[in-house]
Structure formats: structure tokens, C-alpha cells
């Protein structure tokens, strides 16, 4: 199981078409960037309710499918080398009302939604009441999802002091709301410019919207 979870391919930076971009955005122009969209979840939410699924794991699974579909969202520095993980797994926040704190919990990704939902449900049942920051422990090949369901927003930025080798995407979901006949949800994503450009984020967000429009409840 460990081999499956942590497999990767090394990138030969000297032969990589993004060599100059990577070196620039990891050194003299080191930066991450954030983008916030108002995602139309009208059809997705309707299907979630129709199939009596929970919104959070269903949406996390869609994000995980997209992260695993594109190598730019699976990159990391490991032992001084740039690598592409064979797969990445969602690490998501679980809120604790009694302490007003949260935990970060990860679940192994599977293409099949129902199999992923089973794993997610087991993880939440086992670790959901644990107040530790990482109750299940930590793995290297994760991307991050945070939920802020108490407020809607039009912009959201993460300000981390040292992001030089942190390439994992970070998503933040806001409170969804009705606008006309649509249900919209704020969604922010932070990526590292060394491995991911605006084109890549734009393509992913367009695919995400299509997934939400066409999602069939994991069938």
C-alpha cells in the first residue's frame, strides 16, 4: 500500500520545457498566486441532494480527480529533485465545534466515487473526533482543501512566509449562495508559479465547472 501511495517519477529539469520558468519562479521571482471564482454548483448540488450524498466528500472527489488528471498539480521537491507523484490524495479540514478548532485529515484517492466515499466515511468515523492537527498522520503527496462555510467571499489569499518548495495546490471553499436561478460557491485556489501557470489553473477550473454541470452522482 505504501508503494502505491508514494510512487513518483523524477523530472529531468535540464530537459524540461519549463526549465527557465521553473528556475525563475523558484528563485528571483519566487511566488505563489491565488485565484477565486464563483463556481456554478446548481446542477451538482441538485444531484448531490437527489442521491442523498454529502456535499463535502462529493466535491472533494471532483477536485481529486482533476488534481490527478494533470501533472502540474502533482509536483513536489523530494530529496533535492523535482518529482511528479503517481497520485495525490486530498487532505481536508474537519471542524470541531466544541473547541472551535479544526483537524487536517487525508483520505486515499480512488477514481471510483463510491469507493472513495467509503474510505472517506471510514476516516471521518475513525479520526473525526480527534482534536490533533494531523490525527491520521502526514503523507507527502497531498493537496489541500479547506472549507469556510460561514461566509461567502470574492477574494481569498493565503499568506505563507516560506513557499519556495511548496507546490501542492490549496483550495478554499466558501459559503454557497443563490443568485437568480443559480447556486454559486466561492472557490479559491493557490498554486506555485514555478510549476503552474494561469493557463493550467484556467483549464482546470473550466473542467471543474464542466464536472459540476455533468456530475451523475458517482454512477
UniProtKB/Swiss-Prot annotation:
Enzyme class: transferase
UniProt-listed GO biological process terms: response to antibiotic
Xref: SMART domains: CAT (SM01059)
InterPro entries with a match to the protein in the record: CAT-like_dom_sf, Chloramphenicol_AcTrfase_AS, Cmp_AcTrfase
Single GO molecular function: chloramphenicol O-acetyltransferase activity
Keyword Acyltransferase found: yes
Domain of life: Bacteria
Catalytic reaction equation(s): chloramphenicol + acetyl-CoA = chloramphenicol 3-acetate + CoA
Active site: 193
Enzyme Commission numbers on file: 2.3.1.28
Keyword GTP-binding: no
Keywords in alphabetical order: Acyltransferase, Antibiotic resistance, Plasmid, Transferase
Pfam families named among the record's database cross-references: CAT (PF00302)
Annotated function: This enzyme is an effector of chloramphenicol resistance in bacteria.
Family of the protein in this entry: Belongs to the chloramphenicol acetyltransferase family.
Classification via PANTHER family: CHLORAMPHENICOL ACETYLTRANSFERASE (PTHR38474:SF2), SLR0299 PROTEIN (PTHR38474)
Oligomeric form and interacting partners: Homotrimer.
NCBIfam families: chloram_CatA
Name the record gives this protein: Chloramphenicol acetyltransferase
Organism from which the protein derives: Klebsiella sp
Top-level taxonomy: Bacteria, Pseudomonadati, Pseudomonadota, Gammaproteobacteria, Enterobacterales
Gene behind this protein: cat
